[in-house]
Structure formats: structure tokens, C-alpha cells
Amino acid sequence: MTKFSVVVAGGGSTFTPGIVLMLLANQDRFPLRALKFYDNDGARQEVIAEACKVILKEKAPDIAFSYTTDPEVAFSDVDFVMAHIRVGKYPMRELDEKIPLRHGVVGQETCGPGGIAYGMRSIGGVLELVDYMEKYSPNAWMLNYSNPAAIVAEATRRLRPNAKILNICDMPIGIESRMAQIVGLQDRKQMRVRYYGLNHWWSAISRSFRKG
């Protein structure tokens, strides 16, 4: 089976170890030969990367692991880019959420005025990653789940229409799982769900139970 090389852009994120564990849990379907982290904050990334190095050494020592702040090193010889960046980091997220609340409107990182502000900041950073990928590994695909997903997806569609990029969000799956728990089911797949809305702002969920 073909083994893949992946770079996680946003390697300094506290969510990155979860991505590593997810990748390791799916080695039977998506085997890795190499895993790299990339971040423009070297100090922050080092803390996360050293922790992940321990995980990989214990669970998958055959996977080559490295981390860097150099785009050429990070994006060369990769098959997939997994991008989850937060432009402005948590200090700006705090402003995105608190400023709208002072004016009596939704204060949320992907919705309302804060979501628009965060989206405008995110576009440039995500496009930069797309350009690095296309320059150093033109055959690679990007899985982008940098928020706000809808704004970023539309920006990449308009500004990089030929880029090999999938913009995704796991919030609908998370909501389905919580709903399944509420109604006493063991798994969200025991429901048939129709989801209306975008990512963190959904208007309705309808469900029907499977027979048997």
C-alpha cells in the first residue's frame, strides 16, 4: 500500500496532537511515511512538536517526523497539506468574540462581526499556504479546516480556482454525535440526519430512526 507524506500547517496549535492521534488511528487506511509540522511561531510549535515526537516514537517509530518554520522544507515532497491556522491567535479571537457582545450581537469566532473579522484575517494566511503547496509540491492536495470555513472556502474558490483544496469542518459531525447521545443512541450513524446551515451556525436538524 502506498504510504503518504503529510505536513500539518499550524503545527503549534494545541489541536495538533489530536490530529496526530487521528492519523495514527487510521494507519490501516491512510499509512504515513513522513509527518511534518509547519508554523510561523517556532517557539510555540516546538512545545507541541516535542510532545508529538514522544507519541510517534511510542506508537509509530517508522514514520519520519520533523518540524520547521521554513516553508520550502515543510512543503517539499508532501502528498497532503492539513491546514488549521489561526491568524491573530487567541488574543484576536477574544476580541472577535467580546467586541460584538458589547454591541448586543452574536459573539462567536465564525459568526457575526467577529466571524467576518476573523475570516478577513484568515484569507491571506490560507492563500499563502496554498501558494507554498503549489510551488513546492504541485501534485499535493490540501485539506483546509481553518475557520471560518465558509469564508475561507469562498475566497480560495475565487482567488485560487484551480488549487487542489478541500475545505472542511467537523462541526456537523460533532453536533450529530451530541444529538445521538441526547436521544440515547450509541452512535450517530444510527440516525439519518439532514443538516441545514453552515458549520457553527445551523438552523435545524431533523432525524429519523432506522428500523431494527
Curated annotation (Swiss-Prot):
GO terms under biological process: carbohydrate metabolic process
Pfam families: Glyco_hydro_4 (PF02056)
PROSITE patterns: GLYCOSYL_HYDROL_F4
Keyword Cell inner membrane applies: no
Keyword NAD in annotation: yes
Annotated NAD(+) binding sites: 4-70
The organism's place on the tree of life at top rank: Bacteria
More about this protein: The GlvG polypeptide of 212 residues cross-reacts with antibodies prepared against the full-length 6-phospho-alpha-D-glucosidase (MalH) from Fusobacterium mortiferum. This operon may be cryptic in wild-type K12 strains.
Family membership: Belongs to the glycosyl hydrolase 4 family.
Protein name (database record): Putative inactive 6-phospho-alpha-glucosidase
The species this protein was found in: Escherichia coli (strain K12)
